[in-house]
Amino acid sequence: MGRKFEVRKVAMAKTAGAKTKVYSKYGKEIYMVAKNGGTDPQANLSLRRLIDKAKKDQVPSHVIDKAIDKAAGGAGEDFTPARYEGFGPGGCMVIVDCLTDNNNRTITDVRNCFTKTNSKIGVTGTVSHMFDHQAVFSFPGDDEDAVLEVLMEADVDVTEVECEEGVITVFAPHTEYFKTRTALTDNNPELEFDADEITFVPQTETVVTGEDVATFDKFMDMLEDCDDVQDVYHNAVVEREGE
């Protein structure tokens, strides 16, 4: 499972690094989480997690503060979550998570990304059953048994603990995120995470090769350019010539 997660992260890093609208995407999500759950990160654990994630992605503090202040003021737009799924280039499985204030616009934009890359958008449940909604933590280490013991003593419902090339990866149900993180940091307050998030981990991989590689890149770029798209998850392993 760890390798699949790492492959997805590598594939997404190239598009994430090219995001010109990353600040607005974070601002929108922080605003909605604060509006729905409260503006105090100590009381709103989802907000705390999102702020930590934004800071890790180098989102400036003023962007975060502005979104929270906007939520505290009670004014502003109402965004609702929307999820679309289907098959991308090469038959890979794709989940697209959005925040929107206009469902018609969003589905039109997302469907356009699928149709212009010979991909197929499906209905709810088309591919999501082939992903596990997981809390994922990775950090330097080589003793997975000791980590598992710490988590079990904290009564964490662990899915899996892996160790590969000096990196330990912990998988747990997404509902166990804070419990897992607290157990790990209480055991080692100096612990620094390479990965620390709630994500969708694919159960299988789809290798994308040949002409499908360029189409896949176009598909990812088009989705990243959609204002309403927040996250894209896929199970593609892209094999590029010369790599």
Swiss-Prot record:
Protein name according to UniProt: Probable transcriptional regulatory protein Patl_0550
Keyword DNA-binding: yes
Keywords: Cytoplasm, DNA-binding, Transcription, Transcription regulation
Organism name: Pseudoalteromonas atlantica (strain T6c / ATCC BAA-1087)
NCBIfam families reported for this sequence: PRK12378.1 (NF009044)
Domain of life: Bacteria
Compartments where located: Cytoplasm
GO molecular function: DNA binding
Family according to the record: Belongs to the TACO1 family.
One GO biological process term: regulation of DNA-templated transcription
HAMAP family to which the protein is assigned, alphabetical: Transcrip_reg_TACO1
Pfam families tied to this protein: TACO1_YebC_N (PF20772), Transcrip_reg (PF01709)
GO CC terms, sorted: cytosol
